[in-house]
Each structure stands twice: as C-alpha cells, then as structure tokens.
Amino acid sequence: WGLYAIPGGEWKGKVYNGAAEWLKSWAKVPAADWLELMKQWNPVKFDARQWARMAKEMGVKYVKITTKHHEGFCLWPSQYSQYTVAQTPYRKDILGELVKAYNDEGIDVHFYFSVMDWSHPDYRYEITSKEDSIAFSRFLTFTDHQLKELATRYPTVKDFWFDGTWDASIKKNGWWTA
C-alpha cells in the first residue's frame, strides 16, 4: 500500500498494465509530480481493527505488511524521511495501527521492506564513480537507520522480508550480505 494506490495503473491518461506499485518507474514520473500525491493520501475509511477481525475470521495466522515499497513512501512516521504518512492529510501511523490490531487478534505480523528506494537522492542503481560510492554509503546508513527504527518502534514484529535487492549497487555491496 502506498501512494501508487491513488493513480492505480494510470498516469496522465495512459494505462500501464501490471503492478500499480511500479507506475512511478514505468511512466517515468518526475519525483516532484509523484510527491504531489501525498496531498491526496487520506484513507479515512481505513480501519485496522476491521482488517484484523476479518483476517482472524478467515483463519489467518500471519500477515506481511508493506512498510515501504520501491517508491520510498513510508507507512510509518519515520524520523529519517519526510516522505511518510505523517506528511499527508491522514497523518496517522498506519503500521502502528495494523501491528496493534493484528497482535490484538493473535495474528503474527511480518514486515515487507524495499531496500531499493527511488525517492532517496543517494540511492544508486550501480556504482560507477567515487561520488556514487560515497552517496550510496550515505544511503546504506539511511537504510540501517530505518530498519533499526522499525525494529525498535514495533518490537512484536516477527521478521522482515526484503525486496528490491537486484540492482548492481546492492548485489555487489558487503552491507547486504553481512
């Protein structure tokens, strides 16, 4: 769940078939245009308790919640990014609401976390220069901070599932394999 839910698979009248969460990349949407979607993010009908009750009724034992997808939009008020739900009209900590609701129903919570982050200025698809290396090092520090923040803020979460790790910058970096 992220800003990509607002346009779905359509941008400026063109429909992009496939996963809506890839729209920013496929449509080559400029960062400033994509950030404008934050002004619209306001899921006022969202009810974490209702989701958790329905999951329990269906016999669900665990859920995997997207903390942020490749677009970098955080569903928690991260102190390391301004690209979060806290900067939207909704303002509430969606992850916190979901974790509490599912835990209250006895359902284990696991987190999905995209290492790739299209919104971060220091993210690099590959490292081709010393400047890239320095920038990517800053990005890895940012990522470490976000992961520690999530683990500390939501201590009942059982594990993390990492996505977006196929770029050369990540594959060739010892940070990821450490």
Name every feature range the model reports, one short phrase each:
Residues 1-178:
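Mature catalytic domains of secreted/periplasmic carbohydrate-active enzymes
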